[in-house]
């Protein structure tokens, strides 16, 4: 299980729950990261990134 949230997740990465349900795409640019709360979205189990 990873610890992240949609705000802090990287653009181009999709985040999924443990049962494979799509939750969100990340909103943070790795070169210019968002200021995000550091909480873990407990629904997010894994990510798949396109690059």
Swiss-Prot record:
<comment type="similarity">
    <text>Belongs to the protease inhibitor I20 (potato type II proteinase inhibitor) family.</text>
</comment>
<dbReference type="InterPro" id="IPR003465">
    <property type="entry name" value="Prot_inh_I20"/>
</dbReference>
<dbReference type="InterPro" id="IPR051391">
    <property type="entry name" value="Protease_inhibitor_I20"/>
</dbReference>
<feature type="disulfide bond">
    <location>
        <begin position="6"/>
        <end position="24"/>
    </location>
</feature>
<keyword id="KW-1015">Disulfide bond</keyword>
<feature type="site" description="Reactive bond for trypsin">
    <location>
        <begin position="38"/>
        <end position="39"/>
    </location>
</feature>
<keyword id="KW-0722">Serine protease inhibitor</keyword>
<dbReference type="Pfam" id="PF02428">
    <property type="entry name" value="Prot_inhib_II"/>
</dbReference>
<feature type="disulfide bond">
    <location>
        <begin position="3"/>
        <end position="40"/>
    </location>
</feature>
<keyword id="KW-0964">Secreted</keyword>
<feature type="disulfide bond">
    <location>
        <begin position="13"/>
        <end position="49"/>
    </location>
</feature>
<keyword id="KW-0646">Protease inhibitor</keyword>
<dbReference type="GO" id="GO:0005576">
    <property type="term" value="C:extracellular region"/>
</dbReference>
<dbReference type="GO" id="GO:0004867">
    <property type="term" value="F:serine-type endopeptidase inhibitor activity"/>
</dbReference>
<protein>
    <recommendedName>
        <fullName>Proteinase inhibitor PTI</fullName>
    </recommendedName>
</protein>
<feature type="disulfide bond">
    <location>
        <begin position="7"/>
        <end position="36"/>
    </location>
</feature>
């Amino acid at each position: 299980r990873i610890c992240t949230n949609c705000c802090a997740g990287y653009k181009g990465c999709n985040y999924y729950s443990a049962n494979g349900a799509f939750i969100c795409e990340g909103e943070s640019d790795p070169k210019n990261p968002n200021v995000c709360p550091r909480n873990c979205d407990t629904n997010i189990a894994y990510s798949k990134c396109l690059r």
